[in-house]
Amino acid sequence: MPRVSLATCRAIPNLDEEDAPLVGALADRGVDARPVVWDDPDVDWAEAGLVVLRSTRDYARRRDDFVAWARSVPRLLNPAAVVEWNTDKHYLEDLRRRGVPVLRTMWLEPEQGLTKRQLHTRFPAGDEFVLKPAVSGGAQDTGRYTANEAESRRLAIQHAVRLLSEGRSVMVQRYQPSVDTLGERSLVFIDGQFRYALHKAAMLHGPSQGPEETHIERIDATEASEVELTVAERVRQAVLAIKEELDEPKGPLLYSRIDLVNDDEGRPTVMEVAVTDPSLHFSHHPGALDVFADAIVARLDGS
């Protein structure tokens, strides 16, 4: 019986509620599937079969360890080189250089040694903005600030100072007002094919409350517009080109989620591209779990 290990983390050793049914779906297809904690020292990854990243939510605080682990796994999806690229949001600059419309981002680096005054002068002068670390997941350590309110600006500076002092790169983006009215749209691709779209309501409502803060996601099924599909396909092609430049084999990624918001002109713009362990929210689309399970089995058959 072929073996599939669904990589997760210690906080959710049996996978999250969206991914847990994948074990049964794969079993129905004759696959020995089981959740495995990625940093469990007792696991022999050479005997783990095909390893599929699913609920490895703690990688942001231990990215170097996570990337080293990914590179040590003989059969990993998505591939380790792509994971390394995707776990640092500087990847947005790679996409921008390839002509993909991405949110404009200002990067603050620890080695710049920026003072509080210098941070103050670099932050936007008006509107709202979002501040977060370049290596993060699940909106952890992410805050929404108002540029022309003194207390909000002070908290933003405090937030940036903390992250930079921890040796973490910081990204600053204008908060897109459309998120409050239209939300975000996530387009999910499985094995290179667009499968379904999701709507996520706004979830940032103020300054960061610290690294342990959690945000409640409100997800619904939606339909992708033709313009959104066009942008998402540009992203997919760009990521494929980057994948080949990283010396990974040709062919589509097993999964990807492309998160879009509207810019001030109403044009879909990339906020994030998730190809490491994105939440795919199978329960919101009939058949989505089966499509994903079939795609995994096809990778087994093709190996």
Model-derived regions: residue spans:
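ATP-dependent carboxylate activation and anion-phosphoryl transfer catalytic cores
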Residues: Q193, P207-S208, V227-S303
